[in-house]
Amino acid sequence: MIRAHLFSEPDNSKLWAKSTGSDAFDLILKVLLWTAPWYYCLTTLFFTWLIILYPRPTLACSVAAWLFWFTSLDTLEPDDRKNTLKASEAVSTSAKTSEETAKPSETREDGEWNTLKNTLEADAQNLMSGFQMLQRRWSQPKTTTLKTEVKEQQASQSPSVEGENEPAGVKSNEATKPSVTEEKEKNAEQNKRRERLSISHIVTELAKKDEVSSESGSNEIVNAKLKNEQLDSNFTLLDAYLEPLVHLHEYSRRSNTLFFFYLPIVMSILIFCLPTQALFIVLSSVFLAWHSPPLQAVLFCIRRISFFNLLYEKFVIGKTKEPAKPVPQPSSNEPPAPSAENKQPSVSSPEKKESPATHLLKVIGSSPYVVHSNHTNNTLTDKESSDPTEKCLYLIEHQRYWVGVGWLNRTLPTDPPNFTNAGSTDPVAEPTAQLLPPDGLAWIDDKWSISPWTFTDTFWAQPAKTQFRTAFTRSREWRRRYRVAPPAENEKPHTSRTNTASSLSSTSEDQVSTHGSISSAKVTAIPDSNGAEAL
């Protein structure tokens, strides 16, 4: 079974998959399925693409990097040895205490030796250098551990101890003590050297979280501990991916510094020397890894930047600044709005979201738009235009071209709605399924007048009367005149005009007159309701 999980996931959320029986094939599958750690995936994919593009320079840089590591590890030393020498100091302290409290009793000496052996073996396993780990993993050489050495020493000392009396045995033990002390010192020196040369120690420490020691009571350690607790409480997926890089400075060494200074130079040389085919390979790799967690995290960080967010909205999704909505001016015949003192809050029903049909009825009731004089059809004369009770309703229809399908009323989420009121982006119902106006209003024109299509690009820019190659959007204007009937004398000025159930009816498609082709509009059935808000 393969255990694949992220650093930020708890133990109970680890994913298990069945192994194929081959370690190399399992690693390849984990990298391709993005279940391995992110640096394994990125380094493997990047190294594979470089091998395909430039095998010689890639192999040369790889060999140079490995030679740098294995040749400079003998001379490089850590900057801070306090954390790295804790294990060796603990071993030396335990060895001194065991020497001082040693007795000729075999039981007590065996217990101390067992404790010391376990400690040294654990430290040797944790502080094993990277080259020795590779040897042990692939070739698995036979290495002499401290346990076998102790057994050999006991076997060599047992004949001399058995044939002598107690004082002689004590003397023999005293004689062997210096050799044991020298062996302990030698092991401590080897542990120090292994700790300095340990690549696995660097890699494993980068993958772990920094643990603040509770021994010291200084303010710096307390503040660091509180900071780590705050980070743990707000630990996100992006923090898990960037965790090795965030904690890199805490394990800074000359080897890391030189390597990460040497690596960008080589990478910059390779990047500037890449031809067009390499650029195509890089773009294809980005396309293949688009849904991978690391790339999504990088894109999420880029979109949070205001400059890139502005470019993304302007050139990718075509989001522009919405025009200012015109302030509706109340008609002279309409009653004034009630003041704040006389206005009583309605307790009958909560506020409901306006539907497109309800919004259209309100637009008809208080439309500030008057018929323009440049319209040739259905225009008003000077005598008629002077009548303040006559107004004109303008609606804008938007459509988008879909490759292989044609022009459809379905638009993108960033596009304007299918039908909007002129000068705003509020959605309204389709004109072919419009209701009769509410009480107090009446249509002047029997049919809707439709202007020709205006073609624009995918960002609703560059308008043109004829369709061009990159015209993926179009819009046209629907207009119809209506008259506002003066209120009756016996009617209260604030009579509700929203009850339109008695005057609801659908108009047929033959009421529409166009100057060009009219797209087939869907006639929506209007259910019976007590008001326009139920639409």
From Swiss-Prot:
Annotated Low complexity bias: 339-349
Keyword entries, A-Z: Glycoprotein, Membrane, Peroxisome, Transmembrane, Transmembrane helix
The keyword Transmembrane belongs to this UniProt entry's keyword annotation: yes
Bias type Pro residues, positions: 325-338
GO biological process terms held by the UniProt record: peroxisome organization
PANTHER family: PEROXISOMAL MEMBRANE PROTEIN PEX30-RELATED
Compositional bias ranges of the Polar residues kind: 142-160, 496-522
Higher taxonomy: Eukaryota, Fungi, Dikarya, Ascomycota, Taphrinomycotina
Peroxisomal side: 1-31, 284-535
Region (Disordered): 87-115, 142-194, 323-353, 482-535
Topological domain spans for side Cytoplasmic: 53-262
Classification via Pfam families: Pex24p
Name assigned to this protein: Peroxisomal membrane protein pex32
Membrane association type: Multi-pass membrane protein
Species for this entry: Schizosaccharomyces pombe (strain 972 / ATCC 24843)
Broad class of the protein's primary localization: membrane
Locations listed in the record: Peroxisome membrane
Presence of keyword Kinase: no
TM region positions: 32-52, 263-283
Start-end of Basic and acidic residues biased regions: 97-111, 180-194
GO cellular component: cytoplasm; peroxisomal membrane
Family: Belongs to the PEX28-32 family. PEX32 subfamily.
InterPro entries: Peroxin/Ferlin, Peroxisomal_PEX28-32, TECPR1-like_DysF
Glycosylation sites: 374, 377, 409, 418
